[in-house]
Curated annotation (Swiss-Prot):
Membrane-spanning parts: none
Presence of keyword Zinc-finger: no
Organism: Mannheimia succiniciproducens (strain KCTC 0769BP / MBEL55E)
Annotated gene: aroQ
Keywords: Amino-acid biosynthesis, Aromatic amino acid biosynthesis, Lyase
GO MF term (any one): 3-dehydroquinate dehydratase activity
Biological role stated in the UniProt entry: Catalyzes a trans-dehydration via an enolate intermediate.
Protein name, as recorded: 3-dehydroquinate dehydratase
Amino acid sequence: MSQLSRILLLNGPNLNMLGAREPKHYGTLSLAAIEANVQALAAKNNIELECFQANSEEKLIDKIHQSFKKVDFILINPAAFTHTSVALRDALLAVAIPFVEIHLSNIHKREPFRHHSYFSDVAEGVICGLGAKGYECAFEFAVEFLAKKA
């Protein structure tokens, strides 16, 4: 029997406030509800999914490093770190785990400082502006990506 594929869902700063934080941009679902939706997809697809959220760059980097040779794919919403964190980008490059960048809002329809991402050019794909549905789309892509590698 083959080993389960492992996917890590990472969420960056302030995403623990989803549901209460700026619903116009981020919707009304909590992070727990989004994670539960993705966990349900993981169960249907026989995928091991770990969810992790941190407001600190250091904790996110440590989690990425701990995933080295233990995780097959990463789904990441770097949140505000999208526009500032070379260190987080470098951590993803160091572990060489394929990943998809996710954003609830369309960062290109927002303030100009949100238009640049330090992750997009090294991600397998970028999903933005689809709200919580973007997490499901990213998960489905990861499943297809891993199936092609198998």
